[in-house]
Structures are given as structure tokens and as C-alpha cells.
């Protein structure tokens, strides 16, 4: 039977509950336990698929096509266990399911209320299909005190009472701010946060205290006394130099030992931290460095590209180099020459995005990379813009454009009206809803024998990658573009949808319709990112 660990947050948002959950899961996993991580989001959206990247950050897509919170990316990267649509739920989804049942008459005329109907739905989600795991870690989004989070806190309060004694614990992540004028860490915000939790019936078992310095023994004692936890359960969560040092830091602070003690479990053995030690050694002592320009639309919000920046870091780990990121707003290139911004970089990456804003800037970035022989990696929208650039400047199709931006005489990129999903054919139109209507999840692609991308994948001729797009390169232009050197080296199994393009006479120029960053891990860097960074290393030696 699985045991449950509920991770809550207090004082301020963005403290790192997702990283804390992922790191704790990795520590338990390294001790030989099977873990599952789930995220409960209190917002009313059905999923983050249509939310602004500036508000929510990245949308993380799973193999089974769920659009989820970016924290699931942390879970996958730290534990290696692929997340599914069953690992993320929102208030909006819960309400939709409840109201659908109410319309069908499933509740037999009962009055639908937050308690018990909403809380029961949350409990069912948390407790479902966990028999194969030793620990289930559930992160509650937001902070204690948020109105929209109250049903979730009530649900996890009930779960601890419903389960046998010792089968569930609460870990509360909080902030210990340092006040320079007073010269001390302040515990009062944490005390008030715990007071708020206790007022709704939840007593934390462990306090995980974010701080930039060591917690003095007296402050640790005070926290234990006023928050009603053991002094040993006041865990110091010190700031670290990179996120992959978090498991090491939490283990050194005794978090995993304290969790097992809270369950009354004798530790099986010390966790196997060798792989984490190797990764952090490479990060802290690189043998060189490269600079990659990310030319995107949402560069003001780094979390919009969370998996992307982490995948580039993984590429650096694979090549034992530090990857410096130069974030450039693509709109800049619509009015200015890209050369002054890009001449110093060793690689250019144009990521995914939606809409016309900044598109011409991405096209100019692709042109610069092609003409200057700078390694170029185009992902999703970045591949589409590279194809439009080739059509305009190599194939002489001056009007080449995407129907996403409006009607065009030369639709190099157009809306996918239908595609196969398993054994079913899905169809879309311009008039349809935006939410949940993209080509989502893992799809296969066939690679051309002898192509660069096949070589990158170790000679593979078939791959599976995650997608999130509703527009696709038009295969009607394939022959004309290939005559000018742009090779369509990857296609869907039916040959209809272009998946990968590349230039054979370029040091490294690859565009992919999928999102390889979603499957990259620190221990298993995605081959495309490892190869891209390797090409950037070669380019850096030529400058």
C-alpha cells in the first residue's frame, strides 16, 4: 500500500515546491523505493494549454497528450519516470467532471456542494491507481490561505484521517527571510503560515525552510517550539548553485531520513548519490563553455522555456561544457540587423511559439545562421520559420508565409485539418476551439537513412517524440525546397507530415516539428541537444 506525502507552500509563491517534490522523490527513489509524483493546481482553467506563458510559464506535454504544469517536467527530469495525464488535475477539470455527472443525473437529484462532492473528487484523483508505488508525493499548487486552494487542503486533511495511522505526512515549504538591518533570519512569517495550516486542521510533520544562509540552532529550536514540530524536522533548504544540487543538499540536511522517520520506516540503506555527484561535478568544473542565443517571443519570462533551458544544460553536461544562454526577443530583429546580436554566439536556437508577433525576427535569425554557418536548432515554430526563410531566399517564393498569420498565396505552413491519433482520425478547423485541439503527445517519425538526424539518433530510422502544434509545413513544397538543399529527413509514417528538415552542406542546421526538450534528462541528455551543443563547441574553436 502506498504512503502519501503532501507538499504545501506558505509565505510566498514560487518558493520551489515543484523542485522540492522532485528532489525528495529522487532521494526516495535512490533508496530503492518506487515513487509517483502528482500536482494539484487550484486554478479554474481546465489545463494550462491556453494560458499565457507570461502568467503560467511553460506548458509541459506528456506522452499521452496532456498539457500540464511545468512542475511535471521537474518530476520527470529528477526521477526519470514519465508523467501522464493522471498526474495533474485542476479545479476546472474537477468542476467540469462534476457538472457533467450532475447533468447526466448521476447524483440522483442531490445538492452539489464543495464538501463532499468536490473534496471527494480530489480524494479520488489522489488515491487512484497507486498500488504499484511505495510513496505518492502530491504537491498542492499556490500557498496556504489562497481561497481557491481550500478544497484541496480540506481533501488532504480528510485523506490523512481516512488512511491508517502513519500512512500520510505533510511537508510544508516556507521562507525564512533575512533582514540585513536586524542581522537575523525571521521566523514569524513561517509561524503565521503554519498557524494558517493548523486552523484548517493540518499539522505539518516537516518544515522545509528556504533560506540563503545557515539556520542558527536557536531559530531552529524556536520554529520547532512554535510550529509544533520536532527540532530535527526543521530542515534547512539552502539556496544552491544549480537545481541538480538540490537532492544532494536536501540529503545533507536530512530531509529523506526525516521523512522515513515520520513514517516509522527504518532506512533500507544510504541513497545511491553517485550519479548526482557526477552530474554536479561536471556542472561545477566544466572543461569549456559555449554561448547559445535563444531567439524567442517570451524571453521576458524564462519559465516559458523551462524544459528548453534545462535540455541545453543537459547538452552541456554531455559535452562537459558550460552553456551560457543569451536571451533575445525576436521582435528586435524586425527593425534591426541581427548580426551585432548574433556574431558572438556559437549556436542559435529558435523555440516554439504562437502568432505573428516576432515571426519575421525568427526568420531573420534562421537566415543569419544559414548564411554564416552558425549551428541552428529550430523547434516547432522555429522549424516552420526556417522553412519559410528557405522558401523566400533560396527557392524564390517571395510570398511564402504561414496561414497562421492570415491568408497567403504561398502557404508554406498551414493548419492541419486532420491527423491520426492511434486508430482514430482527428479533425480540426479554423472555427474550432483553441483548448485541447492541437496535435498533442507522442507520435512516431520515420528518419531517412544516411541523414544527419538519423546519425544523431544513433542510426535509428524510427523515433517517437512529443508534439504540441496545430500548424504544419506544407508537403506540396517539399520537392521545390529539396532542390535548393533543404532536406526533409523526417516524416510521419504515412509520409504526409514533415517532422524534420536539415541542410546537408551546413555544419549543423536542424529543424524539428516536435519538442525534444520535453524528453531530455540530466542522466540521459536528448541526443539532439547533445549534438547541438557539440556543434556549438566545434564552432567556438573556429572563431
UniProtKB/Swiss-Prot annotation:
Pathway: Pyrimidine metabolism; CTP biosynthesis via de novo pathway; CTP from UDP: step 2/2. Transmembrane segments: none annotated. ATP binds at residues 14-19, 71, 238-240. UTP binds at residues 13, 186-191, 222. GO terms for cellular component: cytosol. Mg(2+) binds at residues 71, 139. Homotetramer. This is CTP synthase. It comes from Rhodopseudomonas palustris (strain BisB18).
